Design a protein with these regions (language model features):
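Soluble acyl-CoA-dependent acyltransferase catalytic core bearing the H(X)4D motif
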Residues: 3-377, 381-444
């Protein structure tokens, strides 16, 4: 494993560097005392360890912050898991966004036990520029047209941030100028908080993680076709249903409840996926937790997703984040907290490779990842597809959702409701159903 890390992970020189905070900003500095043994650790689970024991270990390892005095990443090779091993990787988000990190991790894998690299990394041969380490330059350089306009609007928000957020009517006045981007800015500025549930609150340091058994991707696609929805619609409606069932089991009210999720949107061209850095936007997706009818809930998720297509929210958020990066840290923290307080969860869906991969001679049976949270966001939802299967994972704050496995275990049941509904469809049917009739036909509300 250490050999693979040295040959394929550390080829990205940034991973030999640490972030050094200076007054008002931070810079990357090479760790002159770098030692791979500090970052690649070999441990073992006790006894006949399974999923529960590994979830407990991941929850424990994920809590303490990475050492800022060293490059902020770590590999834990865990022996004695289900007769094999597991690899737990922690990488600070300052190095790269999810799309770039997935590309980095896949560059370490092989297409067979003794096969060639599955996704070889061939960095462009050019002389490094002085501004290569500038996060702002990395964000601005590929932008043109609407992206640059988003940066300008983001800069406006940074300059006039307090006025706009404290007096939303000023944001509305901006929208009346006719710009689609400023209209989106008005929506963000006037957006209220989502429903107060046990998924929302100030997170503490202790976390809990859980993941579901994988679903066949072809089956998810078939259900989506039968019901007139996308794979994402199906999966997100199951997430909403599982969260609803969990709240109901806890005795919490669910009527009219909406949980809003921040969804990162990749804005990086695929040909530049090898580059590190963060280049993503954000959209706010509303999950209709208050809907009991699974078919109605599916169509509500679908409509919410459709309303975001073509939205300027992602590029506007990128502009805001990039402009924030050039502003004082106090303003960065304030605006980030404002964005975060309007949501209860971060939700990421990553399309993984659909063929088996090997790492250091061992076949990879499954992949899972978790996303960081900030502000009042206490839940991270992760969906990843790999080798013909799709996996659902959850990370929660121990203080207000100490048992994410109780949410996870309800995910499969919500999917089965949609399977039953699809099976009741006439042969060859594809498209919308009447939610009430469909629900009654399969015996669900």
């Amino acid at each position: 494993l250490k050999r693979v890390v040295e040959e394929r992970f550390l080829v990205f020189r940034r991973f030999r560097q640490r972030a050094v905070e200076l007054p008002g900003y931070a810079v990357w500095e090479t760790d002159r005392d770098f030692d791979i043994d500090r970052h690649a650790v070999h441990i073992a689970l006790p006894g006949r360890a399974g999923k529960r024991e590994l979830q407990t270990l991941v929850s424990r390892l994920i809590a303490p912050p990475l050492d800022p005095a060293r490059p902020m990443w770590q590999y834990h090779l865990v022996e004695n898991y289900r007769g094999g091993s597991a690899l737990i990787v922690r990488i600070h988000h300052s190095y790269a966004d999810g799309m770039a990190l997935v590309r980095v991790m896949l560059s370490m894998t092989d297409a067979g036990r003794d096969g060639p690299p599955a996704m070889p990394f061939n960095p462009p041969k050019r002389k490094a520029r002085a501004d290569d380490d500038s996060a702002l330059a990395a964000l601005i350089s590929p932008m043109s047209g609407v992206m640059k306009t988003a940066m300008q609007v983001g800069s406006l928000l940074v300059e006039r941030g307090a006025d706009l957020w404290n007096d939303p009517s000023k944001a509305v006045a901006l929208a009346n100028q006719g710009s689609a981007l400023t209209a989106e800015l008005a929506k963000l500025a006037t957006m209220g908080e989502d429903s107060r549930t046990r998924f929302k609150g100030r997170p503490g340091p202790a976390k809990r993680v859980a993941w579901a058994e994988p679903l066949p991707l072809d089956e998810v696609k078939a259900i989506g076709r039968a019901l007139g929805a996308s794979v994402n619609d199906v999966l997100l409606s199951c997430v909403a249903g599982a969260m609803r069932a969990y709240l109901h089991a806890k005795g919490d009210p669910t009527g009219g409840v909406t949980v809003r999720a921040l969804v990162p949107v990749n804005l990086r061209p695929m040909e530049k996926a090898y580059k590190l850095g963060n280049q993503f936007g954000l959209v706010f997706l509303e999950l209709p937790i208050g809907m009991e009818n699974p078919v109605a809930r599916l169509y509500a998720v679908r409509e919410n997703m459709r309303s975001l297509r073509g939205s300027y929210q992602p590029v506007l958020a990128l502009g805001i984040l990039a402009a924030m990066g050039a502003g004082p840290k106090l303003l960065q923290d304030t605006l980030l907290a404002i964005l975060a307080r309007n949501a209860s969860a971060v939700m990421t869906n990553v399309p993984g490779p659909q063929q088996p991969l090997w790492l250091a001679g061992a076949r990879i049976d499954g992949l899972m990842f978790w996303v960081p949270q900030s502000g009042d966001i206490g839940v991270g939802v992760s969906i990843i597809s790999y080798d013909g299967k799709v996996q659902f994972g959850l990370i929660t704050d121990k203080g207000f959702c100490p048992d994410p496995a109780r949410v996870i275990e309800r995910f499969g049941g919500e999917f089965e409701k949609l399977v039953l509904t699809a099976l009741m469809c006439p042969w060859g049917h594809s498209g919308d159903l009447d939610p009430e009739k469909a629900a009654r036909a399969v015996g669900v509300a």
